[in-house]
């Protein structure tokens, strides 16, 4: 296992880019950065915010970057000149607490909402998933989720998997041609696992980061654990990338509790190791 980069304030939302770099959000400094396999780091997007902010992102099939502006309840789209425009207004579907995003191969963007601000100690409320179609219209397509977190879409575009952190499970939905979700079911009951960011591989297995248990876990549909990577720090998200997508990247840092999310200094890092199967699907 190697450290690809260090000095991250609060890393999240890793994505393997078309430019052969690992992109990730650093919530603590309100930016999206990219790092190549030699560890060369570049700040790609700086968001105009004066305080700690949740940032998640993904790309449309044509390469345009979408960024979730959680506080404003908007899905932003970055233009060729780096300017940001509103791609969709998300607040018609739920109150601001927007979290993760995944875009499938058809250009359907799924954005989930925790429905409460756990960092402020708000009382739990069930969350939801909104669908943003390629034309920028948004509507709710799933509800009643126990802290929806990382999401992934299988390579056939037929299944969306969502981590329910508070329910300790991965939940799956069928995806219709128009992006609607149906046939909700438990994809994997994780026992004591607490899933955060997730990704899927070409053998049909899923990886999930686990913050309180300080590990990254590969699991099969049905819940069988295939591999556990024990870590010294909490794993907030994971991504399969590299030239053949056979490298597992893990975003890790010390977890100080929800009330101290902005107080972690620069102790975050991204670790990498070989994976048993290449990445597949989205992200």
Regions found by a protein language model. Give the residues of each.
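Short, solvent-exposed loop/turn segments at conserved positions within beta-propeller repeat blades
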Residues: 27-28, 70-71, 116-126, 165-168, ...
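Beta-rich, blade/repeat-based domains predominating
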Residues: 5-21, 48-69, 92-109, 115-116, ...
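Loop/turn-rich, solvent-exposed surfaces of beta-rich toroidal or solenoidal domains
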Residues: 168-169, 173, 184, 188-221
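Blade-level signature of beta-propeller repeat domains, shared across WD40, Kelch, NHL, RCC1
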Residues: 239-283
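Short loop/turn segments immediately following beta-strands, especially the blade-tip
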Residues: 173-180, 275-280
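A short beta-strand motif characteristic of beta-propeller blades
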Residues: 1-5, 40-47, 84-91, 137-143, ...
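A short loop-to-beta-strand structural motif that recurs across blades of beta-propeller domains
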Residues: 31-33, 74-76, 127-130, 169-171, ...
């Amino acid at each position: 296992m190697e450290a690809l980069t260090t000095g991250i304030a609060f890393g999240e939302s890793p994505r393997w880019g078309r430019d052969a770099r690992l992109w990730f959000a650093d919530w603590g400094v309100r930016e999206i950065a990219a790092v190549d396999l030699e560890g060369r780091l570049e700040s790609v997007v700086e968001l105009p915010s004066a305080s700690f902010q949740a940032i998640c992102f993904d790309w449309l099939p044509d390469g345009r970057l979408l960024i979730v502006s959680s506080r404003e309840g908007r899905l932003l789209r970055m233009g060729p000149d780096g300017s940001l425009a509103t791609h969709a207004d998300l607040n018609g579907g739920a109150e601001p607490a927007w979290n993760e995003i995944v875009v499938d191969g058809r250009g359907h963007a799924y954005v989930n909402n925790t429905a409460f601000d756990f960092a402020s100690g708000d009382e739990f409320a069930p969350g939801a998933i909104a669908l943003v179609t390629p034309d920028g219209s948004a509507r709710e397509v799933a509800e009643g989720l126990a802290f929806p977190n990382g999401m992934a879409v299988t390579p056939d575009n037929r299944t969306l998997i969502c981590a329910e952190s508070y329910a300790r499970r991965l939940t799956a939905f069928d995806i219709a041609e128009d992006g609607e979700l149906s046939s909700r079911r438990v994809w994997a009951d994780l026992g004591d696992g607490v899933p955060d960011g997730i990704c899927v591989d070409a053998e049909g297995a899923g990886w999930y980061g686990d913050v309180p248990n300080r590990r990254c876990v590969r699991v099969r549909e049905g819940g069988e654990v295939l591999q556990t990577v024990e870590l010294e720090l909490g794993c907030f998200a994971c991504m399969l990338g590299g030239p053949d997508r056979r490298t597992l990247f893990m975003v890790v840092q010390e977890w100080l509790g929800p009330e101290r999310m902005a107080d972690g200094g620069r102790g975050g890092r991204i670790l990498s190791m070989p994976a048993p199967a290449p990445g597949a699907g989205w992200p």
